[in-house]
Swiss-Prot record:
Keyword Transport: no
Comment text on domains: The RxLR-dEER motif acts to carry the protein into the host cell cytoplasm through binding to cell surface phosphatidylinositol-3-phosphate.
Function: Secreted effector that completely suppresses the host cell death induced by cell death-inducing proteins.
Protein name from the UniProt record: Secreted RxLR effector protein 7
Encoding gene, per UniProt annotation: RXLR7
Motif (RxLR-dEER): 48-65
Signal peptide region: 1-21
Length: 127
């Protein structure tokens, strides 16, 4: 059975090299230690386009990349603080009398607490 997989893999390698040879696309090597096709579909993605843009020169691409990185860092920081914030809100909600609570706020606090616990469980499962 194992030899069938080896034969199948060899056939796929031969077939893919023949298809690549027939396609006629010229591959260009960039300084990223990988070879990419000039018309690759991945180039249409915004992050890849910003990284390898040949048409846009100057600070426009850098500004967009910095905005994305700032937003990503803000989101990550918020996710890291979410469990602590939920715990503080949970403690505060216990100290307030039930008659003084607004039902909507109590529900939001409870949802945040459960979301924080779910995040912690996911992180511990990944480890």
């Amino acid at each position: 059975m194992r030899s069938a997989y080896y034969v199948l893999t060899a056939l796929l390698v031969v077939a893919s090299s023949q298809v690549a040879a027939e396609s006629g696309h010229q591959l260009q090597a960039y300084g990223h230690d990988r070879i990419t096709d000039d018309n690759a579909a991945m180039k249409s993605l915004s992050t890849r386009f910003l990284r390898e843009s040949r048409d846009v020169h100057g600070n426009v691409a850098n500004e967009e990349r910095s905005v994305y990185s700032v937003l990503a860092s803000m989101i990550n920081e918020g996710i890291e603080k979410m469990p602590r914030t939920a715990e503080v809100l949970k403690r505060k909600s216990r100290s307030i009398k039930d008659s003084d609570k607004v039902p909507h706020e109590a529900k939001l606090v409870n949802e945040m607490f459960h979301a924080a616990k779910a995040k912690e469980m996911m992180q511990s499962a990944e480890e």
